Curated annotation (Swiss-Prot):
Transmembrane segments: none annotated. The lineage of its organism: Bacteria, Pseudomonadati, Pseudomonadota, Gammaproteobacteria, Enterobacterales. Residues 155-303 form the TRUD domain. It catalyses: uridine(13) in tRNA = pseudouridine(13) in tRNA. Responsible for synthesis of pseudouridine from uracil-13 in transfer RNAs. Belongs to the pseudouridine synthase TruD family. GO terms for biological process: tRNA pseudouridine synthesis. InterPro entries: PsdUridine_synth_cat_dom_sf (IPR020103), PsdUridine_synth_TruD (IPR001656), PsdUridine_synth_TruD_CS (IPR020119), PsdUridine_synth_TruD_insert (IPR011760), TruD_catalytic (IPR042214), TruD_insert_sf (IPR043165), TruD_pseudoU_synthase (IPR050170). This is tRNA pseudouridine synthase D. Keywords: Isomerase, tRNA processing. One of its GO terms (cellular component) is cytosol.
Amino acid sequence: MIEFDNLTYLHGKPQGTGLLKANPEDFVVVEDLGFEPDGEGEHILVRILKNGCNTRFVADALAKFLKIHAREVSFAGQKDKHAVTEQWLCARVPGKEMPDLSAFQLEGCQVLEYARHKRKLRLGALKGNAFTLVLREVSNRDDVEQRLNDICVKGVPNYFGAQRFGIGGSNLQGAQRWAQTNTPVRDRNKRSFWLSAARSALFNQIVAERLKKADVNQVVDGDALQLAGRGSWFVATTEELAELQRRVNDKELMITAALPGSGEWGTQREALAFEQAAVAAETELQALLVREKVEAARRAMLLYPQQLSWNWWDDVTVEIRFWLPAGSFATSVVRELINTTGDYAHIAE
């Protein structure tokens, strides 16, 4: 299995180094749910600004403040502890008057707004995230500048970031041990983290191998293509390749790679044979996913950061802003820019 740091680059290995997250203010994330609170209902959506505390810790503190069980507070995604982040929490408080959440106090956390909502906020139920990153001690400004311009045109590999695999790869290692021993895992969180790490690692492997072999944006017979921003896909046939290639070049269509699991992967013929060969050595992880009934799915191979802009504060410091759809990783953008001395594994999704 290819380690995250050794995955194939789209724009070649960066020529310079830099520091990511010298302090929390260098990594700012603003969650974009893609909808507004309903203004009524048994739930309360709470937008918080936090620095130095993780999402679960804040959710538990909010539950305690509201005198409800911790499971009654949900969120769309974990946000990094060592960053400045804005996100929404959702508390189920039926049949009660609206509590005064301005009285909620927690070090490093501030309530920005809150309102009633009809539905529970579920994990993954967000449109995306806006990022503002500051890279410091950049050793090669010209290389980073060129790469930023190239990313505007060609995007970056849509890899799952190192944080998906746990600190030191602990989640992937757990999945590998589980796959080898077939010992039942009772802890639901471990099961979820380990299965997610296994499937993500296989996806990364497929994308890395495709980048090695050919132009990642070259449509081949049997590729599974999806409309940009959509989840469904269709299979490319030889007769359609020229037209489909035009639509891919125009970023109307995205070529996908497999998220292996039970059931058909979605590709056929040449594309399917390539994907199967790319992960042929990982039979135990594949068998684990099938055994645990994790359904196969698809994910775009490339990621195009939206609203990408940057500003050089000086020759060694650059502020970069962009928006990514849910499930994408800012670290997969950063790794195409610099060899970073920051710690990827501590950056939450």
